């Protein structure tokens, strides 16, 4: 594999990783703060 192809593949895989991480974070926020907020906010101590 030549260096140019490796750098291109590394760049694309990094972009894919960041996009996947963003989607996972958005879904986690949706699930834990919108759909099922009850036990998590109480565990974190936001309702005293």
Curated annotation (Swiss-Prot):
Alphabetical UniProt keywords: Fimbrium biogenesis
Annotated protein name in UniProt: Fimbrial assembly protein, serogroup E2
Organism: Dichelobacter nodosus (Bacteroides nodosus)
């Amino acid at each position: 594999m030549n260096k140019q192809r490796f750098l291109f593949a590394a760049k694309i895989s990094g972009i894919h990783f960041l996009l996947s991480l963003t989607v996972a974070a958005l879904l986690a926020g949706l699930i834990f703060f919108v759909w099922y907020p009850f036990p998590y906010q109480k565990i974190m101590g936001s309702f005293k």
